[in-house]
Curated annotation (Swiss-Prot):
Residues given in the record as Mg(2+) 2 binding sites: N216, D219, D427
UniProt subunit comment: Homodimer.
Protein name: K(+)-insensitive pyrophosphate-energized proton pump
Location of this chain's protein in the cell: Cell inner membrane
Main subcellular location of this protein, as a coarse class: membrane
Function: Proton pump that utilizes the energy of pyrophosphate hydrolysis as the driving force for proton movement across the membrane. Generates a proton motive force.
UniProt similarity note: Belongs to the H(+)-translocating pyrophosphatase (TC 3.A.10) family. K(+)-insensitive subfamily.
Residues reported to bind substrate: K186, K650
Keywords: Calcium, Cell inner membrane, Cell membrane, Hydrogen ion transport, Ion transport, Magnesium, Membrane, Metal-binding, Translocase, Transmembrane, Transmembrane helix, Transport
Binding-site residues, Ca(2+): D617, D643, D647
Organism annotation: Xanthomonas campestris pv. campestris (strain ATCC 33913 / DSM 3586 / NCPPB 528 / LMG 568 / P 25)
Ranges that cross the membrane: 5-25, 65-85, 129-149, 164-184, 231-251, 258-278, 287-307, 321-341, 384-404, 405-425, 458-478, 500-520, 568-588, 590-610
Enzymatic reactions: diphosphate + H2O + H(+)(in) = 2 phosphate + 2 H(+)(out)
Gene Ontology cellular component list: plasma membrane
């Protein structure tokens, strides 16, 4: 009976999140969208974003159909159906979220005419839609498919293997969306900056720049649709991995270990919806403070709600209900720590960013050296925090305790994605205000909103990486337990004296570097093509710089769309193909080594790239705020170079490593019956 009510609670909360998202979308779209010029610019951004996503999803669907058939033939059709559900829901969360985002941008710009409170309301509500859809659709997919399989009378083991298929489907969408969106957005950004700011000397978001619309489109497909797919996948994967681990250790964890993570996710949705209502800013008030207030309220309410649920469901757990409650609290505390650490390394008010800005005064080279130093140093505190969380959670609840800490951390995804999706909305709002030549007081509202948006985007990347590392660790635990269950007569230990384990470790360690290199080179090629196109238009359409002729915005958008789709395919298949080859050729121990190697180097490479890139970006903004000579100074030119390097670091290669480390683990989990 308790099981039935718990499942209904999870499904009810998932539906509540989707209803909240739909009502908020209706409210946002009902807001005024400004004058004809603003609407024209917004329509161009909407058209570009839609064209890109349609082509991206068409390409993914071709790969998806092939994988659907392979999974069905070699594993089971229930797993294949799960794969399809995960892929469709992940794509849907990103698609709807992005469609709202490209409508909220112009409405935020219009609301900025009436002050910061109104503009903040529109921008945050626009972001909250994506956040609630991610957790709502994620929980609905996992709990709904689980409920259907249970109703069909399938054994628990078969149910959970089918859910691993759902995790694989969401992961596939995630890596394509993260990588393709990242190549598009940074190809546009770097190309627009190199010719616009550096060569032509025109400011950011200047309507004379032929790549300016592509740049604004990129903000949405990268930071909104890309992040939505990334955290949808991490959310779904973590819940499924925790359910699977609970089922494999039922004797220790008690009869409700499979249901517990679903209920935690459900009550956290209610906490996030209440927390979102607290995000209000008064004129002269702190924007970041208002956003953090929402996160803190959500976290505190979730912590309160976890207690009765844990006591009701986990009384029969060998570690005790209060020990598991402590594990859930560790997950929430880790969320706060990761957010604070990332802000420290990427916020303009702190030492690391100011150090990079100061280094810019002595030239381009010293800016790069300082940025690389910060990017490497920034790995220390987050990794120590993750290690402390793993130690604490294991102490209280064993491997299942680590899984619960990861689930609690991911249960805040609704609120965290809202912070992230707020970023491209305010960024676009500033761009629209600039291109539509709105009065300076509008930019005085959109600029501080955008500055905070840059920090929230960096913070959510840190959160996504930390949670991905924990999720991958839980998946690895599932892999080892599944191996043991499938081969009860053999003892599986990943011994460093075993040469196949060492080979696996080394191959796993190189994959994030190889993948990151492919992503960086792809952005370089895409940006180079944009630079050539922008130069051609400046040369062949002489009236652009004087404002008498209009640039061909659609050329850059179309070129980047084709380039991003082409470039994303090979790197995205890397984490699917490599574990299959290693597992089938070298065996399960080498595959285990591969998983650990990828988790370790993936965590460091991802943190280093995203935080370092964020520090370069905000060092440029710090100088633009009037420090070290301000805009147009030699320090500013050096900072633009650093930002140009940092852009693909933080928005393409770094974030795409998150889904990479999880896909490798999921593929390994699916391979267990074949090993």
């Amino acid at each position: 009976m308790l099981e039935h009510y718990g499942l209904m609670l999870a499904l009810g909360c998932a539906v509540l999140a989707i209803v909240y998202g739909m009502l908020s979308a209706r409210w946002v779209v009902a807001q005024p969208s400004g004058n004809a010029r603003m609407q024209e610019i917004a329509a161009a951004i909407q058209e570009g974003a839609r064209a890109y996503l349609n082509r991206q999803y068409l390409t993914i669907s071709i790969a998806g159909v092939v994988l659907f058939v392979l999974v069905g033939l070699f594993l089971s059709w229930y797993t294949a159906i799960g794969f399809a559900i995960g892929a469709v829901l992940s794509g849907l969360a990103g698609y709807i979220g992005m469609n709202v985002s490209v409508r909220a941008n112009v409405r935020t710009a219009q609301a900025a005419r009436h002050g910061i409170s109104k503009a903040m309301d529109v921008a945050f509500r626009g972001g909250a839609i994506t956040g609630m859809l991610v957790v709502g659709l994620g929980l609905l997919g996992v709990a709904g498919y689980f409920a259907i399989l249970q109703a069909m009378g399938l054994p628990l083991e078969q149910n959970l293997h089918a859910l691993v298929g759902l995790a694989f489907g969401s992961s596939l969408i995630s890596i394509f969306a993260r990588l393709g969106g990242g190549i598009f957005t940074k190809g546009a950004d770097v190309g627009a900056d190199l010719v616009g700011k550096v060569e032509a000397g025109i400011p950011e978001d200047d309507p004379r720049n032929p790549a300016v619309i592509a740049d604004n489109v990129g903000d949405n497909v990268g930071d909104c649709a890309g992040m939505a797919a990334d955290l949808f996948e991490t959310y779904a994967v973590t819940v499924i991995a925790t359910m699977l681990l609970g089922s494999l250790t039922l004797a220790e964890t008690g009869p409700h270990a499979v249901l517990y993570p679903l209920v935690l996710g459900g009550v956290s949705i209610v906490a996030s919806i209440i927390g979102a209502a607290f995000v209000k800013v008064k004129p002269g008030g702190s924007i970041m403070g208002a956003l953090y207030k929402g996160v803190i309220v959500s976290g505190v309410l979730a912590a309160i709600a976890y207690l009765p649920i844990t006591q009701a469901l986990m009384r029969e757990n060998a570690h005790g209900a209060m020990s598991l409650y402590a594990c859930a609290l560790i997950g929430l505390v880790l969320t706060g720590l990761i957010v604070w650490i990332t802000e420290y390394y990427t916020g303009t008010q702190y030492g690391p960013v100011q150090h990079v800005a100061a280094a810019s005064t002595t030239g381009h080279g010293t800016n790069i050296i300082a940025g690389l130093g910060i990017s490497m140093k920034s790995t220390a505190l987050p990794v120590i925090a993750v290690c402390a969380a793993i130690w604490g959670a294991f102490h209280f609840g064993g491997l299942y305790g680590i899984a619960i800490a990861a689930t609690a951390m991911l249960s805040m995804a609704g609120m965290i994605v809202a912070l992230d999706a707020y970023g491209p909305i305010t960024d676009n709002a500033g761009g629209i205000a600039e291109m539509a030549e709105l009065p300076p007081e509008v930019r005085n509202v959109t600029d501080p909103l955008d500055a905070v948006g840059n920090t929230t985007k960096a913070v959510t990347k840190g959160y996504a990486i930390g949670s991905a590392a924990l999720a991958a660790l839980v998946l690895f635990a599932d892999y080892t337990h599944n191996l043991q269950a499938a081969n009860p007569n053999e003892v599986f230990a990943f011994d460093l004296s075993d040469h196949t384990v060492i080979i696996g470790l080394l191959i796993g360690g190189l994959i994030p570097y190889l993948f990151g290199a492919m992503a960086m080179e792809a952005v370089g090629r895409a940006a180079g093509a944009v630079v050539e196109e922008v130069r051609r238009q400046f040369r062949d359409i002489p009236g652009i710089m004087t404002g008498t002729a209009k640039p061909q915005y659609d050329r850059a958008v179309d070129m980047l769309t084709r380039s991003a789709i082409r470039e994303m395919i090979v790197p995205s298949l890397l984490p699917v193909v490599v574990p299959v080859i290693v597992g089938l050729l070298l065996g399960p121990r080498a595959l285990g080594g591969l998983l650990i190697g990828t988790i370790v180097t993936g965590l460091f490479v991802a943190i280093s790239m995203t935080t370092g890139g964020g520090a370069w970006d905000n060092a440029k903004k710090y100088i633009e705020d009037g420090h070290f000579g301000g805009k147009g100074s030699e320090a500013h030119k050096a900072a633009i170079t650093g930002d140009t390097v940092g852009d693909p670091y933080k928005d393409t290669a770094g974030p795409a490593i998150n889904p990479l480390i999880k896909i490798i683990n999921i593929v390994a989990l699916l391979l267990v019956p074949l090993l």
